[in-house]
């Protein structure tokens, strides 16, 4: 549904520009899918039943035919019949590990193989995997090595906890690209976004629209697509309704919010009792609008402090471009972003440690003195009371 919304938002009609295919073993789930698509004005070819079990059948004969593959498969599926899975083909890098019961006990690399296999010669894929899949061992590692050698692994992004309603564990986004430019064939972009997100509530995180744009911007610059980056910077200025530098805009917004909060407090105190809630609601709405702009300004600063006018750079703790030799020989074919980007340097808060410790020590001495004086006063009062 979101893919259709994305295409429609871009000015194209999803039903005219895309063909949606799906297969699902459980018929009820397939019916839900069709109903959901109909509600959103989309149509699709969805097959269901045993003949639509993805592990054992390519129900639409899509192997090698897809321009784009997007997927959020179930993680760590077990008890997949190895013989049936192998007979269904779509395994360009071979079978994952098979247990004594002749089953695949973890199907993550079956999914990865399928997504790659479905692509045509210029296809692209993007999908979600558990974080463990980026450096799992044994046969998984063999498949991963073969995959890396193709030069089609494009971007790997680590995602924080709580991005799914049903799973709290961190995950990883994988992107394949069979039409990578010649200069990028030997490279993979790693992004560690585990510390970059917006908290929705105690159990759910997400990327805001501007955060998604910022992550896209990193990929654009990696690919040399600087026009898209400049357009995003222009969008920031438009949203902020100012031509000042982003830091100045941020400072001005913070000042406006402080002033508005002070004004709200005074207005509520001066309002009649029955009008207080109405007055407060009016100011809350105005402050929320300013807060939204402040958030946008902070995201603009986050991006431009790292990439300036639009030149890609490896940022410790955030992003790193690595070549295949480094990945295969130095990192043991690991695709874990954290193994490449490292740790972000701690920000200098401008406080001299020695001087601050002296200040704290002096504060403690003064507090101790006040405490002693208070105890003496209490003791004296108790004596006067004959206690």
Language-model-derived ranges and their functions:
Residues 65-66, 88, 106-107, 122-128, ...:
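Active-site lining segments that contact anionic ligands and/or coordinate catalytic metals
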């Amino acid at each position: 549904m979101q893919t259709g919304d994305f295409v429609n938002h871009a000015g194209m009609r999803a039903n005219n520009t895309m063909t949606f295919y799906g297969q699902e073993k459980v018929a009820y789930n397939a019916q839900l899918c069709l109903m959901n698509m109909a509600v959103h004005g989309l149509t699709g070819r969805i097959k269901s039943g045993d003949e639509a079990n993805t592990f054992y059948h390519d129900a639409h004969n899509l192997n090698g035919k897809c321009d784009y593959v997007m997927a959020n498969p179930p993680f760590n599926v077990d008890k997949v019949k190895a013989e049936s899975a192998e007979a269904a083909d779509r395994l360009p890098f071979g079978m994952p590990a098979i247990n004594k019961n002749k089953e695949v006990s973890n199907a993550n690399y079956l999914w990865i193989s399928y997504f790659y296999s479905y692509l045509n010669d210029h296809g692209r894929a993007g999908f979600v995997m558990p974080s463990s899949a980026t450096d799992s061992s044994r046969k998984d590692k063999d498949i991963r090595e073969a995959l890396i050698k193709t030069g089609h692994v494009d971007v790997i992004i680590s995602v924080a906890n709580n991005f799914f309603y049903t799973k709290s564990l961190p995950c990883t986004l994988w992107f394949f690209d069979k039409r990578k430019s010649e200069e990028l064939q030997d490279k993979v972009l790693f992004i560690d976004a585990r510390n970059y997100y917006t908290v929705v509530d105690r159990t759910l995180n997400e990327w805001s629209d501007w955060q998604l744009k910022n992550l896209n911007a990193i990929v654009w610059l990696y690919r040399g697509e600087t026009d898209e980056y400049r357009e995003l910077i222009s969008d920031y200025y438009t949203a902020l309704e100012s031509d000042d530098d982003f830091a100045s805009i941020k400072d001005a917004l913070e000042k406006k919010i402080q002033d508005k909060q002070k004004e709200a407090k005074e207005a509520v105190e001066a309002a009649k009792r029955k009008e207080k809630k109405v007055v407060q609601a009016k100011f809350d709405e105005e402050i929320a609008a300013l807060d939204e702009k402040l958030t946008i300004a902070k995201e603009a600063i986050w991006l431009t402090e790292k990439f300036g006018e639009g030149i890609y750079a490896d940022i410790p703790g955030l992003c790193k471009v690595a070549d295949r030799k480094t990945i295969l020989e130095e990192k043991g074919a690991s695709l874990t972003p954290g193994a490449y980007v490292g740790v972000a340097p701690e920000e200098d808060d401008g406080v001299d440690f020695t001087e601050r410790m002296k200040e704290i020590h002096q504060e403690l001495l003064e507090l101790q003195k006040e405490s002693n004086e208070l105890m003496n006063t209490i003791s004296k009062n108790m004596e006067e009371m004959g206690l």
